[in-house]
Amino acid sequence: MYRKGDMEMGKQTAWEEIDKKSSEIFTASDEIWGCAETAFTEDKSMKILCDVLKAEGFTVDTGLADVKTAFKGTFGSGKPVIGILGEFDALSGLDQEAGATEKIVVHDGASGHGCGHNMLGTASLSAAIGIKKYLEESGKPGTVIYFGCPGEEGGSGKAFMAKGGVFADLDAAITWHPGDLTQADTGSSLANYQVAYKFYGKSAHAGGAPHLGRSALDALELMNMGVQFLREHVVPEARIHYAITNTGGYSPNVVQPYAEVLYLIRAPKNSQVEEIYQRVNKIAEGAAHMTETRVEIDFVKGCSNLMSNKVIAKELWDNLVELGAPEYTEEEMKFAKAISEGVGDSRFESLEKIAKNCKDKAAKAEVLSHKGESMYRFVAPFNPDGIMSFGSTDVGDVSWNCPTAQAYVATWAAGTPGHSWQVVSQGKSGLAHKGLIYAAKAMAGAAIDMYEDPEIIAKAKAEMEEELDGDTYHCPIPDGCKPRAIGMKM
């Protein structure tokens, strides 16, 4: 039997520790912003996070599941075991001067934290530090594990970790993501596979002896044409994207002996992605057969659909509401206003999307009343029905292993588009720092709710069991597939 007073005291202990250690967390976030390392190359960023974990008394293990930059920091003993997920990879080609209200590239072609993962990883670390303090002070049984999860951007790092059993023993997992709005996520996302199709032909003089050539590029184009016809005959929520990554050279007078295309196949469930994948493979093989070329199918990565746990999401939402949004300085609001207005009319889209999914008219009106604000300081209404995202996240693979929930917290100006120079510019600002501390406290608070009241985890597990309906986790990544850094030869 838990006592509410103990829960509130425990939260205050954690929140005070988070405030006390905020300076070192801001330093770590800003340093990771400066490293801006892309998927599976995050060695410096990993060291920054691991150094803080070691200094705070966590037991650190690296190279989890044979993923070089995957790690964890553990504190405590016994049940429940709660995981806090952190990310720290950047995006290629998004270098940007910090604090600027216009696009200013400092190092052309360099990477940048256009998705705010410098904040994501450090806020989760801050939450783990707060939880550790609570466990020490309360003397209660329980374990907190901070997971350093690399390669979220295009690498599905957590899926590789899940394949290695990294999350199998967790009772619950919590994470968050930076954004322009604050809300508890109750929705789902699409599972996906990323696959390279490599066509091998035979070169020849395109004018003098075209009959001797077998064009790999012809095969690739025929494959793409076949997939275009397939699109009508898959589930409506499916998405099939592609990028031609090698056309066989720059000489039109040569029959191209090699060509390559990268496909990203999405659908609501892993089984649907697998079905579409097999059909795409047949199209690729048919294209090769038509052109007397050869195709090699190279599976790059995959991730599962997200199953947001509404029981834990509600705990996150309650803590976000209890804490309330940060207060910003006049200078910070001036900066936010310049960024938000610079986005243009599209800055209202995220707000309007939230309002559209409010069933209660009063709640919808309340959300829309914030239109025109430079920084959204309200918590979006809790939506138990959830909204399907047509994107994908490797948090999905964690959610198939244990009850998992995530929050979105405002860390940048209203309407800021993700994966943009505007996100990078705001990544070291007061907006970012205050938002990540808000997120850290909400995650720590939700975790303490679960340590103090075992019934919460019991209900979360019951919800997950009902959602699975007898299904079990099967990692979408096949045996032998290894994580690949961006730009690594396929």
List where the protein language model places each region.
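Acidic/His- and Gly-rich active-site-bordering loop/insert found
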Residues: G10-H113, N118, T122-T143
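General structural feature for long, well-ordered alpha-helical segments within catalytic domains
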Residues: G10, K21-A28, T41-V52, P80, ...
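Metal-dependent amide/peptide-bond hydrolase catalytic core
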Residues: E221-M490
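Histidine/acidic-residue-rich, glycine-tolerant segments that coordinate divalent metal ions
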Residues: T69, L91-G93, A100-G112, N118-M119, ...
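Divalent metal-coordination and catalytic microenvironments
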Residues: I32, G73, I84, H117, ...
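Non-cysteine beta-strand/loop elements that form the S-adenosyl-L-methionine
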Residues: G83-L85, Y200, A407-A410
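Short, Lys/Arg-enriched N-terminal segments with co-localized hydrophobic residues
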Residues: M1-E8
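Conserved short loop/turn motifs at secondary-structure junctions
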Residues: E37-T38, F147-G151, V300-N305
